[in-house]
Amino acid sequence: MEWPNPVTLATANLAIIDTSVYIDNLRSRRFEKELLGLQFIVRCSAVVLAELSGGARSREMSRFVDTMAKNLRIIAPNEREWVESGKIVARLVAAKGYDIHKAREIHFDVLIALTARRMGAYLITCDASDFIAIRDLVGFNLICW
């Protein structure tokens, strides 16, 4: 796990937690210690909320999503980020040969990354390969667990 140094934290103390971290933690409590020890102010991506809501298969998961929506500041991609995200997905498809299903899946990740970049926030994920591919095209702060 790669943590930013304290000087960086003083200037960029916001974080967006990716869907993959929430899902892994809900299933196995894998990141419980890391989440409780975060030295960031967490902002919730509207895209992450949508992914979690769409995948909620239990009452516990639905309650978790509702609690997040009530208690965290929600941030959403703006119009420019939506337009830019399509261009980035097209570049990823051309470079990596993604099929239509992978292109749709990674489109959400691109939107999350662009929102994090605009805010100067760290994006925390356990889906390293996709976000590293995105970061190769778009600079943003990334922490992979």
Question: What are the functions of these language-model segments?
Answer:
Residues V21-Y22, V48, E81, I112, ...:
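Alpha-helix capping/helix-boundary segments
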Residues M1-V48, S53-T67, L72:
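Short, well-structured N-terminal submotif of metal-dependent ribonuclease cores
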Residues R59-R63, L92-V93, F140-C144:
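Short, hinge-like loop/turn segments at secondary-structure boundaries
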Residues R73-H101:
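Acidic catalytic patch
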